[in-house]
């Protein structure tokens, strides 16, 4: 669908620029509408994804749909399950940013792992609130795999505090160190939050490191291509 209007919901303000640039580099020639609500993430951290957050996610998604979005991407993994619930209540495609990454992680781990052990996926996050939603998403994909897959999760201590304090360099260093350590045992490494993606740049590892922005953007564009002209 040429010239499609894309809607994106973020909980980290900087990701609006990240995804805008990413989508424009693909040659997307339609409007891109961004909504930012940092309170969704702070609420999820404080008390989980409760009914209030679910209602707010639905409100934002409905607003984007009413504003003419042909497809919607929510770029926060911590609220992914609320996104799936909202998707069933609007008339346009609504995608969670980490779904494509989860599919790829399990497929790559199964492909790369030696035959004498289970495939291993390492999940890194800077926020504990993200590990539950991402872990459950991965486990749902693991259930369909044709061999055992182990998922190990870890929070990168200090990285979130550094980022919230404006110290992106320390955030990236801590995440980079955690990626390097995880590569010793994992067949695939998953960075659970889109805000972690920059920390993987420049690392020279034999293990694939998957981030959600590219996969999420590709899935969004694929969704609009399937829409009638």
Where do the model's predicted regions map?
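Non-catalytic structural scaffold of enzyme domains
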Residues: 1-229
């Amino acid at each position: 669908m040429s010239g499609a209007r894309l809607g994106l919901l973020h909980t980290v303000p900087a990701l609006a620029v990240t995804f805008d640039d990413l989508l424009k580099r693909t040659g997307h020639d339609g409007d891109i509408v961004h909504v930012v609500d940092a309170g969704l993430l702070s609420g999820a951290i404080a008390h989980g994804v409760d009914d209030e957050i679910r209602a707010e996610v639905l409100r934002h998604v409905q607003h984007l749909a009413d504003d003419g979005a042909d497809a919607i991407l929510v770029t926060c993994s911590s609220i992914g399950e609320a996104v799936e619930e909202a998707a069933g209540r609007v008339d346009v495609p609504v995608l969670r940013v980490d779904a494509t990454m989860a599919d790829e992680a399990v497929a790559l781990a199964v492909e790369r792992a030696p035959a004498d052990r289970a495939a291993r996926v390492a999940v890194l996050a800077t926020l504990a609130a993200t590990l539950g939603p991402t872990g459950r998403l991965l486990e749902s994909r693991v259930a369909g795999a044709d061999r055992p897959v182990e998922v190990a999760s870890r929070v990168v201590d200090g990285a979130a505090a550094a980022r919230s304090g404006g110290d992106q360099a320390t955030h990236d260093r801590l995440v980079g160190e955690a990626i390097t350590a995880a590569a010793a045992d994992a067949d695939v490494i998953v960075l659970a939050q889109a805000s972690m993606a920059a920390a993987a740049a420049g690392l020279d590892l034999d293990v694939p490191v998957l981030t959600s922005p590219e996969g999420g953007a590709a899935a969004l564009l694929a969704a609009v291509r399937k829409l009638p002209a």
